Amino acid sequence: MVEYYDVLGVQRNASPEDIKKAYRKLALKWHPDKNPDNKDEAERRFKEVAEAYEVLSDSKKRDIYDKYGKEGLTGGGGGSHFDNPYEFGFTFRSPDDVFRDFFGGRDPFSFDLFADDPFDDFFGRRGHRANRSRPGGSFLSTFGGFPAFGPTFSPFDSGFSSSFGSFGGHGGFSSFSSSSFGGSGMGNFRSVSTSTKVVNGRRVTTKRIVENGQERIEVEEDGQLKSLTINGKEQLLRLDNK
């Protein structure tokens, strides 16, 4: 039987912070899209990691699991437990839903550089990561050579810095949306992310598209295209604006 603490590689007295860090690391490692050549095992591991996190990150579920094991949550234990709110069975969520919720609704495969770091809220280190960076390529470079943003960009590093900088301050974040899809091969992967911020009274929309190994970033201000970057190279624009 699967032992959730072993799945996450943590001790039984692990703190909530330890459990979050373990899930983050393993979910990224075993995400099926990152393991196209080992998809069956990746899907199994990804599901196990999601189940373990869903139980151990919730104090009530974790307490029941510690007392009765997985059967205490699924209703398969011996008899009824008067203090078990999941007496009639707890239903696990989709591992994709757990993954999406953990990353704040943002798809890491269409990570938006211009939005706030999604891990600030989880690890409480906002304002303490100013110039930290790590050498090495982008996480996206593991997807068959997708272009990286630069030698220090790693979207899943809790302390990454980007050469793109930021729009400055908290400019009134309006919205964020993303989507991605792809098969087991690397020739049909596509991800799209769009974010909108209000900066100094101007509506700034950033769209990032990764498709078939090519990355395209478009930045618009009040509906007008202001910059276009393809595979890390800024393109010259012919703007007919008055």
Curated annotation (Swiss-Prot):
One of its GO terms (biological process) is chaperone-mediated protein folding. CDD domains: DnaJ (cd06257). PROSITE patterns: DNAJ_1, DNAJ_2. One of its GO terms (cellular component) is perinuclear region of cytoplasm. Pfam families: DnaJ. Keywords: Chaperone, Cytoplasm, Nucleus. It is found in: Cytoplasm, Perinuclear region; Nucleus. This is DnaJ homolog subfamily B member 6. Residues 3-69 form the J domain. Homooligomer. Transmembrane segments: none annotated. GO terms for molecular function: Hsp70 protein binding; unfolded protein binding. Has a stimulatory effect on the ATPase activity of HSP70 in a dose-dependent and time-dependent manner and hence acts as a co-chaperone of HSP70. Plays an indispensable role in the organization of KRT8/KRT18 filaments. Acts as an endogenous molecular chaperone for neuronal proteins including huntingtin. Suppresses aggregation and toxicity of polyglutamine-containing, aggregation-prone proteins. Also reduces cellular toxicity and caspase-3 activity. The keyword Zinc does not apply.
